Amino acid sequence: MIFVIESKLLQIYRNRNRNINFYTTMDNIMSAEYYLSLYAKYNSKNLDVFRNMLQAIEPSGNNYHILHAYCGIKGLDERFVEELLHRGYSPNETDDDGNYPLHIASKINNNRIVAMLLTHGADPNACDKHNKTPLYYLSGTDDEVIERINLLVQYGAKINNSVDEEGCGPLLACTDPSERVFKKIMSIGFEARIVDKFGKNHIHRHLMSDNPKASTISWMMKLGISPSKPDHDGNTPLHIVCSKTVKNVDIIDLLLPSTDVNKQNKFGDSPLTLLIKTLSPAHLINKLLSTSNVITDQTVNICIFYDRDDVLEIINDKGKQYDSTDFKMAVEVGSIRCVKYLLDNDIICEDAMYYAVLSEYETMVDYLLFNHFSVDFVVNGHTCMSECVRLNNPVILSKLMLHNPTSETMYLTMKAIEKDRLDKSIIIPFIAYFVLMHPDFCKNRRYFTSYKRFVTDYVHEGVSYEVFDDYF
């Protein structure tokens, strides 16, 4: 295949030297560049063969981007690039992706090609489509990266005068640097105490990398980078590490002394609440709690919402007292574990059943019924049964009716349903059965009158109501 490509290029070269019109010549040049671009894809390349091929080539400005293609070959002998540069290919033209040859060579860590391009006039301050100069691309070993930094700076790379799309300079964009590289970049004049357009400093950004390390953060702190600075959303580095699914305890230990664990971001989250929300182990949460003199109500509420009875116990051991409001919230959010913990510690809310009904947590209703919570509590004129009607929930209604509400409760239930003009259809059978099982109900004029009106207002007008004539 290489022989075929070489033959094609030789034929194009011969045709170019004959008496051929301009358009045919341009077609030949474009064809030659096409075959040269194919040659770039072969693993085995011969410099002499390459030089022969170049005899048929003149830079055409077409979309083959020959110089870019060869600069992107790992381990390529820089003499191939040198031949292209001597042939007239410009090191300061972009390909279709907005990359310069110098950016491409920097990305693949080919310092010899970087040096070759720079000596032939490549602009070390040119920006790609991400607004990054070659200094942003610092892959490779420490020695290779430092060598490339020296090359770029030697040929005029400017310091601290460029930012990429995220508002980062080259130093800030390097999210996982080695200590040697970081110090080298700083030694040539880069400013360490800077932030990106989101207000994140080097520690923030390192924590967002794939493999953040406590050792890296430690020497960043020694270089004067703040471990407690909040970004524009109010997140400190500790917020970030606490929000991750996998927690790095060494990093948490490193950041804890300098950060208030109750400091809230603009979304109302603190490092402590983020640990709770991400279902972190209790011992890790205890580590943060041990640094705080104040345990906020928000922390307790988050524990309840996420059903963390284990954390409630830790908080209680630190002196935090719970009350009926906490029990009520646990019922409302369906936190069975927290309800059980509070109940075991004699913390209750007498009208808990009412709020369990409002939340429509059947399991919570069952748990409260099992623990003998009353179905007779009335809140603002509404009963547990009237709220079942409002919610159109016959399942919970049937559970409550099986636990013997009082006659007064049923009277108030009917009053609430009529007052709010609720649909009576789901409760009529339950009330009828209740009256049947509680004959004393109809011996009370107030109860009986209300019941008669409640039923007759619902049943069709043509129905006889003589069944009620025996009373009063």
UniProtKB/Swiss-Prot annotation:
Keyword Transport applies: no
Chief localization: host cell
Compartment annotation: Host cytoplasm
Entries under InterPro entries matching the protein: Ankyrin_rpt, Ankyrin_rpt-contain_sf
Induction annotation: Expressed in the early phase of the viral replicative cycle.
Keyword Cytoplasm: no
PANTHER family (UniProt xref): ANKYRIN REPEAT AND PROTEIN KINASE DOMAIN-CONTAINING PROTEIN (PTHR24198), ANKYRIN REPEAT-CONTAINING PROTEIN-RELATED (PTHR24198:SF165)
Name under which the protein is recorded: Inhibitor of Apoptosis OPG037
Organism lineage string: Viruses, Varidnaviria, Bamfordvirae, Nucleocytoviricota, Pokkesviricetes
